[in-house]
UniProtKB/Swiss-Prot annotation:
Protein name: Glutamyl-tRNA(Gln) amidotransferase subunit E
This enzyme's EC code(s): 6.3.5.-
Keyword check for ATP-binding: yes
Gene Ontology CC: cytoplasm
């Protein structure tokens, strides 16, 4: 679908959430590590919404509370404390986190506030034990450059990350407290982004600036992108949790398609004088002998019912595609699933099907007085769930008559989105009373400004000049998780070519990961020991791969133990010559027959025996010399 984004009035804003790599959490002194071992215990909580300073209840919080879920929090005795459990007041904010956040703000040309206030942001999905997230507003009015123009940075906040979701059991959600409180920066852009491509470029640029500090966490889940999208006559939609940079373009594009199609459906409904009948019909009797397994299973439940709602003028539109593979009926189903916890719904645009017969559909339509242009939605489950689900469908169908409802949606892996909750209102923020205002002195800002890191484009040019890296490798290295380690290794081992160090960090490690080795077990010391062994001639460069594999398998072993295990003890030049002479002697008939043309065959035999134990260039030089002597 070809879209003129200027014509449709596309506006996009980004919210980037990036974890900071600090020693302690933002409001306590627990370490910022995630654990996969068994927790020491768990507590159970129920959260309820309260009035804001304005005497209002946030609508998103109210929806969450109506679900009536319990929240189970897993904890560890040695890496979580009473602050995470909301049993102790917060400690003063981490100065390390504050410094990093201000560094990021200055790199994005922002104005830092003189006094920073901590606020509470209502969060009642259970991801915070307190029912709110603490956030500190630090800077405003900055900008970044893209190829399509400037993008304003409206705010930068320092805030605590949420607890880590482990499992949703339906009536209860399990969280681990190891992630709760890890410092992160929230960077919000102005709605200056006009195309999907520009959105991706802006997100990439912000990511590059964050990585330039060398003080942010890397890996899955450490950076999350939320995208605010709207078009003319549509509505603002917040898409949560886009983790893959390459997905941003598709998410924006598909959301524009969704809104355009919802507007077309609205226009068609208005032409038909469509109406949502606000009555729920009990149609259990019609489906009591239905062959549909879903309906059979629902009716076996205690108080199991089949009920329906009538949507006048909706026929053919409930089944209309609004995003690739998703229909208006999917929107109804998403809302019912989230609000009531049902498995889904049926609608007459897709029936008879799924074990529901034509005769049953006919009886259904007669019972609710549906005409040819009408659609009927049915849900089967426990009666209380069915009623809540159909109330949600009625609400969503009424919104279809208006156009595009404001929503918070979650990103799906295919670039589509699904309903998550209503868009939060302004009533969700109020002051944090346990933390005094933070005075940010000019001297403190100037000290940080004087020590700002190189921006990626500056480092790129320096890497090409100083380390003789080509454009592709320099670009990879600048954005690499290992960029600081790369420079340290180059300084320590000057007789090792920087190109070899760079290709090892950006190429070799990925190769061995693809082979199934857990490179997360590799620490900086393992790589340093590997290059030290190379520098001292203990191994040849061909042995680097096997050494690193060895450290993945035995991370607690020393370099000498790894060399012993892998059979990679380096050989002297004399020992190499002796082995090559033996190989030539063994294949003398080939040498006599082919002369110097036997080189390729012999080199293969030599490297099979000497790989990792002797430098390939040394083997090559000795072999050629010996062949000439024959």
């Amino acid at each position: 679908m070809e879209i003129n984004y200027e014509k449709v009035g596309l506006k996009v804003g980004l919210e980037i959430h990036q974890q900071l790599n600090t020693k302690r959490k933002l409001f306590c002194h627990c370490p910022t590590i995630l654990r996969d071992d068994e927790p020491d215990g768990e507590i159970v909580r129920v959260l309820r919404p309260s009035l804001s300073e304005m005497g209002e209840v946030d609508r998103a919080a109210l929806i969450e509370a109506r679900k009536g879920k319990k929240f189970i929090y897993q904890f560890y005795n040695d890496t979580t404390c009473l602050v995470e459990l909301d049993e102790e007041p917060p400690h003063p904010p981490s100065e390390e986190a504050l410094r990093i956040a201000l560094e990021v703000a200055l790199l994005m040309n922002m104005n830092v506030v003189d006094v920073a206030y901590t606020m509470r942001k209502i969060v009642i999905d259970g991801s915070n034990t307190s029912g709110f997230q603490r956030t500190i507003f630090l800077a405003r009015d900055g900008y970044i450059e893209t190829s399509e123009g400037k993008v304003g940075i409206t705010s930068l906040c320092l805030e605590e990350d949420a607890a880590r979701k482990i499992e949703d059991r339906g009536d209860a959600v399990v969280y681990n407290l190891d992630r709760l409180g890890i410092p992160l920066v929230e960077i919000s852009t102005a709605p200056d982004i006009k195309t999907p491509k520009m959105a991706k470029e802006a997100a990439r640029r912000i990511g590059e600036i964050l990585r330039a500090t060398g003080k942010v966490k890397r890996g899955l889940g450490t950076i999350r992108q939320d995208i605010n999208i709207s078009i003319k006559d549509g509505a603002r939609i917040e898409v949560k949790g886009v983790q893959d940079l390459d997905l941003i373009e598709k998410v924006v594009e598909n959301e524009v398609i969704r809104q355009l199609n919802l507007l077309k459906i609205r226009d068609e409904l208005r032409e038909r004088n469509a109406e949502v009948v606000e009555k729920i019909f009990d149609v259990t009797e019609i489906f009591k002998d239905c062959k549909s397994k879903i309906i059979q299973n629902a009716l076996k439940k205690k108080n199991g019912k089949v009920k329906a709602v009538l949507l006048k003028g909706f026929a053919g539109l409930v089944g209309k595609e609004i995003q690739p593979g998703r229909r208006l009926g999917t929107e109804f189903s998403d809302r019912a699933k989230v609000i009531a916890g049902v498995g889904g719904l049926f609608h007459t645009d897709e029936l008879p099907k799924y074990g529901i017969t034509e005769e049953e559909v006919k009886k259904l339509k007669e019972f609710v007085n549906a005409e040819e242009n009408d659609a009927v939605i049915i849900v089967a489950d426990e009666e209380s769930k069915v009623d809540r689900a159909l109330e949600a469908v009625i609400e969503r169908a009424k919104e279809a008559l208006i156009g595009v409802p404001e929503e918070t949606r979650r990103a799906l892996e295919d670039g589509n989105t699904a309903y998550l909750r209503p868009l939060p209102g302004a009533a969700r923020m109020y002051p944090e009373t346990d933390i005094p205002p933070i005075i940010i002195k000019k001297e403190f800002i100037e000290e940080i400004r004087a020590n700002l890191p190189e921006l990626p484009e500056e480092k790129f040019e320096r890497f090409k000049k100083e380390y003789k890296l080509n454009d592709e490798l320099a670009k990879k290295m600048v954005l690499s998780y290992y960029v600081d380690l790369f420079e340290d290794l180059c300084k320590k081992f000057k007789n090792v070519k920087p190109v070899l160090i760079a290709t090892t960090l950006e190429g070799t490690l990925k190769e061995i990961k693809r082979e199934g080795y857990d490179i997360d077990k590799l620490e900086d010391r393992h790589l340093e020991e590997t290059f030290k062994a190379l520098s001292e001639g203990k191994i040849a460069k061909e042995g680097i791969v096997e050494v690193l594999k060895g450290f993945c398998e035995f991370p607690d072993k020393s370099i000498d133990e790894i060399l012993e295990i892998k059979g990679l003890k380096g050989l002297s030049k004399e020992e190499v010559e002796k082995i090559i002479e033996g190989i030539i002697k063994e294949h003398l008939n080939v040498v006599k027959e082919k002369g110097e043309k036997a080189y390729g065959f012999l080199m293969g035999r030599c490297m099979a025996k000497l790989r990792g134990k002797a430098d390939g260039k040394l083997v090559n030089d000795i072999l050629r010399k010996k062949l000439k002597e024959i």
